[in-house]
């Protein structure tokens, strides 16, 4: 039986990390986790990592699509934080960011790793940005690395 399974090391991969500036005090930790995972676990060279900053999570899909369209990247990691407030704004932003990034991934033919926190409160966001619940930026980066390798294996199979 042939089993295809992605590995985490991707030393030659070119990865874009796109991050929302809104809630930067959380997102900066997500970026730190993602870049650390790319370099330490994935063995990605510093010069092969591009960091792109957008105003907020709603703008992530457009920037990710444009980066994918350049065909210069093997994967893109999208990072941001949307915290529920007292209005319906949370549902719109979180839903559009999620849906938009999923559409880009399917249409661009490269992995788009979803590292957007959608939390009820700031405490949950902090926990997921490197404290109690790990670092979701690092997790998204590892998803991107694994998918780069897996898609290469599928192509070669």
From Swiss-Prot:
What does the sequence similarity comment in the record state about its family? Belongs to the DMRL synthase family.
One GO MF annotation is: 6,7-dimethyl-8-ribityllumazine synthase activity
- Could you tell me which species this protein originates from? Actinobacillus succinogenes (strain ATCC 55618 / DSM 22257 / CCUG 43843 / 130Z)
Q: What is its EC number?
A: 2.5.1.78
Q: Which GO terms describe its biological process?
A: riboflavin biosynthetic process
> What is the name of this protein?
6,7-dimethyl-8-ribityllumazine synthase
Pfam families linked: DMRL_synthase
Q: How does it assemble?
A: Forms an icosahedral capsid composed of 60 subunits, arranged as a dodecamer of pentamers.
Q: What does this protein do?
A: Catalyzes the formation of 6,7-dimethyl-8-ribityllumazine by condensation of 5-amino-6-(D-ribitylamino)uracil with 3,4-dihydroxy-2-butanone 4-phosphate. This is the penultimate step in the biosynthesis of riboflavin.
Residues binding 5-amino-6-(D-ribitylamino)uracil = 22, 57-59, 81-83, 114
Record gene name: ribH
Concerning NCBIfam families, the annotation shows: lumazine-synth, PRK00061.1-4
Tree of life domain = Bacteria
Name the reaction it catalyses.
Answer: (2S)-2-hydroxy-3-oxobutyl phosphate + 5-amino-6-(D-ribitylamino)uracil = 6,7-dimethyl-8-(1-D-ribityl)lumazine + phosphate + 2 H2O + H(+)
Q: Which InterPro entries match?
A: LS (IPR034964), LS/RS (IPR002180), LS/RS_sf (IPR036467)
Q: Where does (2S)-2-hydroxy-3-oxobutyl phosphate bind?
A: 86-87, 128
Q: In which pathway does it act?
A: Cofactor biosynthesis; riboflavin biosynthesis; riboflavin from 2-hydroxy-3-oxobutyl phosphate and 5-amino-6-(D-ribitylamino)uracil: step 1/2
Where are the catalytic residues? 89 (proton donor)
Enzyme kind, highest EC tier = transferase
Cellular component terms (Gene Ontology): cytosol; riboflavin synthase complex
| Keyword annotations of the record | Riboflavin biosynthesis, Transferase
Lineage, opening ranks:
Bacteria, Pseudomonadati, Pseudomonadota, Gammaproteobacteria, Pasteurellales
């Amino acid at each position: 039986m042939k089993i295809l399974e992605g590995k985490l090391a991707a030393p030659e991969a070119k990865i874009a990390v796109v991050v929302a500036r809104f809630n930067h005090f959380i997102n900066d930790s997500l970026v730190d986790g993602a870049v650390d995972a790319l370099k330490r676990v994935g063995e990605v060279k510093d010069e092969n990592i591009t960091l792109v900053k957008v105003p907020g999570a709603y703008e992530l899909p457009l920037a990710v699509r444009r980066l994918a369209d350049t065909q210069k990247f093997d994967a893109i990691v999208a990072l941001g934080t949307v915290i529920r407030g007292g209005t319906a704004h949370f549902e719109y932003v979180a839903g559009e960011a999620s849906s938009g990034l999923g559409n880009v991934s399917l249409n661009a033919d490269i992995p788009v790793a979803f590292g957007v926190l959608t939390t009820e409160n700031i405490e949950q966001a902090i926990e997921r940005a490197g404290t109690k619940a790990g670092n979701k930026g690092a997790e998204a980066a590892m998803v991107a690395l694994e998918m780069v390798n897996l898609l290469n294996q599928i192509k070669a199979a």
